[in-house]
UniProtKB/Swiss-Prot annotation:
Keywords: NAD, Transferase. This is Probable RNA 2'-phosphotransferase. Its EC number is 2.7.1.-. Belongs to the KptA/TPT1 family. GO terms for biological process: tRNA splicing, via endonucleolytic cleavage and ligation. It is an enzyme of class 2 (transferase).
Amino acid sequence: MTQAKLETEVSKYMSYVLRHAPEAAGLTLDAEGWVSFDELEKALTSKYDVSRADIIEIVENNPKNRFTIVDNRIRANQGHSVDVDLALTPVEPPAALYHGTSSANWHSIEREGLKKMQRHHVHLSADVETAKIVATRRKGEYLILRVDAARMFSEGHSFFVSDNGVWLAESVPVQYLSPDAGTP
């Protein structure tokens, strides 16, 4: 396996255990999603041929900044399906935010809005380009939705920003959504 493939595989496994199944690696997350870096290192080095320095490099070079290391603890920045409280503070959003998805999802979204599904929040992007990157990870045609974040916020909905800059909301009701002109 090439070094690049190994790094990708380790990063995906880290996302899996830090966001969805810590028990798969024998880990226990605290209430805010943190785990000892030493414990994660032990789990990763028993499964992969990586060193502590390799793991730190994977975290630091992750293009999506999925992880944060503080005081020998590590956590995923968002996207959890396990019960954690990321201790996020509500903030005022920009006027518009964006959500990239598969066009096949539009019929359900136009009836029900955006739901968090198995996650703690709906993930939103600050710009069309980022939403497009998210949307094109899925197969088939994609759709970029514009969220009227200013109106949503003024009507009492909360927004948060994760440590890696992803905007988060509990849900996005349909009245705040419109297909964006950036959609093909």
